[in-house]
Amino acid sequence: MMTDNRNTILAVILSGLVLIAWQYFYNVPAMEKQRAQQQAQAELQKTTPQPTASATPGATPQSGGAAQPSTPAAGQQAQPVVARDAAIAASPRVKIDTPRIAGSISLKGGRIDDVALVQYRETVDPKSPPIVLYSPSGTAEPYYAEFGWVPATGVTAKLPDAQTLWQQDGSGSLTPTTPAVLKWDNGEGLTFRRTISVDDHYLFTIKDEVSNVGNAPVTLYPFALISRHGTPQVSGYYILHEGLIGYLDGLQEYAYKKIDEAKSVNFKATNGWLGMTDKYWASALLPDTSAQLQARFSSNPVGNVHTYQTDYLLDPVTVAIGGSATANARLFAGAKEAGVVGINFPLAGHGGYNKELNLNHFDLLIDWGWFYFITKPMFLGLDFFYRFFGNFGISILLVTVIVKLLFFPLANKSYASMAKMKSIQPQLQALKERYPDDKVKQQQEMMEIYRKEKINPVAGCLPVVIQIPVFFSLYKVLFVTIEMRQAPFYGWIKDLSAPDPTNLFNLFGLIPLDPTTIPVFGHYLALGIWPIIMGITMWFQMKLNPTPPDPTQQMIFNWMPLIFTFMLAGFPAGLVIYWAWNNTLSVLQQSFIMRRNGVKVELFDNLKATFARKAT
């Protein structure tokens, strides 16, 4: 077999092994795990009452000077699960009305516990319900943020807690132009005032004030927490982090299972942030950048249900008689949009909250992965073209062209070397005939020919090898960025981040059957139109080189496009479109370079030979 064919086969097999490993360690386990979690969660919601949590964090301050508070108890108690609407109606509320958020603030406890993201729907159907981020205590999956004060050790003053009923100062909804003001008097000389503001995106600003008209000073610790009841379903498996996250003297990531084992982890940091992240959505506490934090990640089991919490305490403040104190906090609760969160990358132009608030690596809320140096610029390129064409599918096609142009010098050298390999095939064949039984002599003479002709025998692997990190980086962009979620292409592709919805095995919808639901093998039966197109383009790419004489190698060449077609069938449609388009460009590029080097392009001759053999 010709050396360029051997190199191509080697590169293809390498890619295939990577894809097989990817399928085995990610796709199939993730699907099985997700199904199991869905079943377990459904049973759990039927049989297990859900807890409500108190508003007190469990971190114990270690600052010097002031008396220390005792560690607050979890204070959780079980109660029956109620419908979300019923739980919302059970307490007086202040409505939240912004271009991106709809919901309410509970006056009982002063919690932000009702947040829906109105610009995002559960499915591609625009009439489907909006994504619900926060839900009140007592529902199936409580998730909320709370702010307040913790007393120092020895302080017995009554402070607002989860049961406190605040009063709204004034009336009306919380909007980007009208903050909500809450107030409460403990009847013992302390009055509390909370001003909550919200911007046009996903940022809440909370200003807590306490005034002391009593007969003794009090020392208090400002706190903030995010609490989430029940273990969420995770979709990323190993490809992205879902769980507790923060930047606390370095990036801290704890998956739910990991924090279940650790129970509680404490941190000290300045200019930090912390919260919980899902694939597309997140909730994060953003203290003042100059604040000294005593932060904590924790998991507290009540029966079979775990309550996950991220919280922090600030340095204590002493409120003198006749004096007052203020604590400021910020809360991000929304979609992980790159332009809103921010991208820390040269010339990115997406400062977002990361730059606006001078936060410490808040862009890491989006998991760009190990190949971030490729993933970030790839996303920026896709986003750039999207702003012009309004379609991420077109952006993928154009970015692929840009990538091809960037790597053209290397590909040109590689394909030129392959073209030279074709030109010396008669010499290599003569060597085999001259030294039929002396493989060592064959190799020595062959390497001498390579040296004389300045040919790199492994150059044919480079185009495919280079494509692998680009492939995974694009997969990462499609998988983790909210911008790609439910982004349509043309025709039947309504979501580039999901597999092609058509399926050959049910005759593209004519038969009422979903083959992908078949256990274990269902993922490989998601054979839509675009995977078939990708397989055809790969088959053309393989036919660009002559068929190798060895029967085993012929079989590899013939079966590889079909194998890749099935392996890529369950991948996001955007990735399959990229692969098909990249194959097409590779065929055109290789043909151009071969012609320029005076080598005949044998694509059509090889196709004719293939069909001629089948005809006979």
From Swiss-Prot:
Function statement: Required for the insertion and/or proper folding and/or complex formation of integral membrane proteins into the membrane. Involved in integration of membrane proteins that insert both dependently and independently of the Sec translocase complex, as well as at least some lipoproteins. Aids folding of multispanning membrane proteins.
Q: How does it assemble?
A: Interacts with the Sec translocase complex via SecD. Specifically interacts with transmembrane segments of nascent integral membrane proteins during membrane integration.
Q: Provide the residue span(s) of the region labelled Disordered.
A: 37-80
Topology versus the membrane: Multi-pass membrane protein
InterPro entries with a match to the protein in the record: Membr_insert_YidC, Membr_insert_YidC_N, YidC/ALB3/OXA1/COX18, YidC/Oxa/ALB_C, YidC_ALB_C, YidC_periplasmic_sf
Family of the protein in this entry: Belongs to the OXA1/ALB3/YidC family. Type 1 subfamily.
**Which Gene3D superfamilies would you find in this protein's record?**
2.70.98.90
Keyword annotations for this protein?
Cell inner membrane, Cell membrane, Chaperone, Membrane, Protein transport, Transmembrane, Transmembrane helix, Transport
What GO biological process terms are annotated to this protein in UniProt?
protein insertion into membrane; protein transport
Q: What is this protein called?
A: Membrane protein insertase YidC
Q: Where in the cell is it found?
A: Cell inner membrane
A single GO CC term for this protein reads: plasma membrane
Q: List GO molecular-function terms, semicolon-separated.
A: membrane insertase activity
**Main subcellular location of this protein, as a coarse class:** membrane
Q: Name one Pfam family in it.
A: YidC_periplas
Instruction: Give the PANTHER family listed for this entry.
Output: CYTOCHROME C OXIDASE ASSEMBLY PROTEIN COX18, MITOCHONDRIAL, OXA1
Q: Where would you find the membrane-spanning parts of this chain?
A: 9-29, 388-408, 462-482, 520-540, 559-579
Residue stretches of biased makeup (Polar residues):
44-71
Organism, as annotated: Bradyrhizobium diazoefficiens (strain JCM 10833 / BCRC 13528 / IAM 13628 / NBRC 14792 / USDA 110)
